[in-house]
């Protein structure tokens, strides 16, 4: 259970290099059952002192006032708080030369100036120091004292009364102070262009408007915060969402793997955490290869494949996804290499894919044939569509035929998700998959994995002949009339 929680945390990190390294480490530990290593202020008064007295720990010092607990309508003024921090006086003409050397001892707070005017001194300025790194003159090391002596600085540590405001608190500090004690605090979200997409839990819903406004305030570039509701569109599998804060404009622009996409986030599916997986599949393709994308969405497989000079046949049942797929092909200047379709995935397999497979089968054997790939990225249902490939080319010869490689995605809540997905794929195909590749994509929830299974479509499935009863000839039941039972002598012990 602890490992699954770690996977859930690392699997939901944004797509950065560091996050991807952490994900790979977590997934590796999952397989070996090992845990990874623990990984506008205003001044009010100024007074001299010899040493700073020990106070609360850092979390308490930088926690907003307890009165904000349970707030359901954001009141920024309620976060004003006075704290005491150490300061030293430094002459104005040398302060810039000293700041770099003192950087590691300065106070670190959002929107807080660390050098301020001293109203009683025209010659010096006050430098705000970190109260947990500087307690007294003894907190400075030898190199600091050499520097002070060089610039004729008297490093007298004094106490300064600093008023923190809402702007000086971090997002997680505010939310931790507002939400009830002992409950999970979320400040994480998926960023989709200017939209912050959150998945709030039930106990957080009474505070959703405060959470949304804080996320909006603390993240430059975010102009809209939305929350996924529990309602799912049964036809297109889209989650409904509500706007918690900011504008209601859901048409956004994102960049993924050097490709630009535009779409209406409220009407299509887009997951910014899948960029690495999209790139992994595109890595299997080379120029002149062919990609069939059964559940194409707005084009995260189709567009980069076309940019790689592949021929692409992309389909999606959702009319909005189809519209934005066409738009993104034009936006990235690959519309001539992509044929888009707006139909059911099963129909796409039985018509378009079948037709194109036959076309490539008729290519002269002397001509270099491309590799064929079929992407099926609808994890909730894609495995169930695999039976559409059974006897797809029932009446066609299979000699010298190019067998396509299928990349099929699925969710699993099983203790062994890789084996579970493989077994279900084999069940819908009606055959065993001796040579397949299993890839753990990401942890969707503490007990839910997203898996990709890749395999060459077996010729026994693609060219399976059916009898008049609609069953494979090799699996027709042997009736007593056709095969009389031999006489078996009864054993004495029976």
Curated annotation (Swiss-Prot):
Ligand binding (S-adenosyl-L-methionine): 278, 316-317, 344-345, 377
UniProt xrefs under InterPro entries: MeTrfase_TRM5/TYW2, SAM-dependent_MTases_sf, TRM5-TYW2-like_MTfase, TRM5/TYW2-like_N, tRNA_Gua_MeTrfase_euk
One Pfam family named in its UniProt record: TRM5-TYW2_MTfase
Methyltransferase among keywords: yes
Assigned keywords, A-Z: Cytoplasm, Methyltransferase, Mitochondrion, Nucleus, S-adenosyl-L-methionine, Transferase, Transit peptide, tRNA processing
Residues annotated as transmembrane: none
Catalytic activity, EC: 2.1.1.228
Cellular component aspect of the GO annotation: mitochondrial matrix; nucleus
GO biological process: tRNA methylation
Subunit structure comment from the entry: Monomer.
Family membership: Belongs to the class I-like SAM-binding methyltransferase superfamily. TRM5/TYW2 family.
Protein function: Involved in mitochondrial tRNA methylation. Specifically methylates the N1 position of guanosine-37 in various tRNAs. Methylation is not dependent on the nature of the nucleoside 5' of the target nucleoside. This is the first step in the biosynthesis of wybutosine (yW), a modified base adjacent to the anticodon of tRNAs and required for accurate decoding.
Name by which UniProt lists this protein: tRNA (guanine(37)-N(1))-methyltransferase
Organism listed in the record: Xenopus tropicalis
Lineage of the organism: Eukaryota, Metazoa, Chordata, Craniata, Vertebrata
């Amino acid at each position: 259970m602890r490992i699954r929680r770690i996977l859930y945390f690392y699997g939901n990190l944004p797509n950065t290099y560091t996050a991807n390294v952490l994900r790979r480490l977590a997934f590796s530990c999952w397989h070996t059952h090992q845990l990874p290593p623990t990984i506008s202020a205003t001044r009010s008064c100024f007074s001299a002192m010899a040493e700073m007295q020990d106070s609360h720990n850092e979390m308490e010092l930088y926690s907003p006032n307890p009165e904000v607990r349970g707030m359901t309508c954001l009141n920024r003024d309620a976060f004003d708080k006075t704290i005491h921090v150490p300061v030293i006086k430094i002459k104005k003409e040398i302060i810039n030369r000293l700041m770099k050397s003192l950087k590691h001892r300065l106070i670190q707070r959002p929107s807080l100036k660390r050098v301020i005017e001293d109203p009683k001194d025209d010659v010096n300025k006050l430098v705000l120091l970190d109260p947990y790194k500087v307690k007294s003159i003894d907190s400075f090391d030898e190199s600091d004292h050499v520097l002070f002596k060089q610039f004729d600085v008297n490093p007298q540590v004094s106490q300064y009364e600093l008023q923190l405001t809402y702007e000086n608190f971090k997002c997680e500090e505010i939310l931790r102070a507002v939400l009830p004690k002992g409950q999970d605090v979320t400040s994480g979200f998926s960023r989709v262009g200017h939209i912050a997409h959150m998945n709030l839990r039930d106990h957080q819903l009474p505070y959703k408007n405060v959470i949304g406004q804080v996320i909006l305030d603390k993240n430059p570039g975010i102009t809209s915060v939305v929350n996924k509701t529990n309602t799912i569109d049964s036809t297109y599998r889209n989650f409904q969402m509500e706007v918690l804060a900011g504008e209601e404009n859901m048409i956004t622009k994102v960049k993924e793997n050097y490709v630009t996409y535009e779409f209406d986030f409220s009407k299509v599916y887009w997951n910014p955490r899948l960029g690495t997986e999209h790139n992994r599949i595109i890595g299997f393709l080379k120029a002149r290869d062919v990609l069939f994308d059964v559940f194409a969405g707005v084009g995260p497989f189709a567009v980069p494949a076309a940019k790689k000079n592949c021929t692409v046949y992309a389909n999606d049942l959702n009319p909005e996804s189809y519209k934005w797929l066409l738009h993104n092909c034009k936006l990235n200047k690959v519309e001539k290499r992509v044929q888009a379709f707006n139909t059911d995935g099963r129909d796409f397999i039985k018509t378009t894919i079948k037709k194109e497979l036959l076309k490539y089968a008729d290519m002269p054997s002397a001509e270099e044939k491309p590799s064929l790939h079929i992407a099926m990225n609808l994890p909730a249902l894609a495995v169930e569509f695999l039976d559409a490939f059974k006897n797809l080319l029932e009446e066609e010869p299979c000699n010298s035929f190019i067998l396509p490689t299928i990349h099929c995605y699925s969710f699993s809540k099983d203790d062994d998700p890789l084996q579970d997905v493989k077994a279900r794929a084999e069940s819908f195909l009606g055959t065993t998959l001796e040579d397949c590749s299993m890839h753990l994509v990401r942890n969707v929830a503490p007990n839910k994995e997203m898996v990709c299974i890749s395999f060459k479509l077996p010729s026994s499935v693609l060219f399976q002949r059916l009898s008049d009863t609609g069953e494979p000839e090799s699996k027709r039941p042997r009736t007593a009339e056709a095969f009389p039972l031999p006489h078996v002598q009864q054993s004495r012990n029976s």
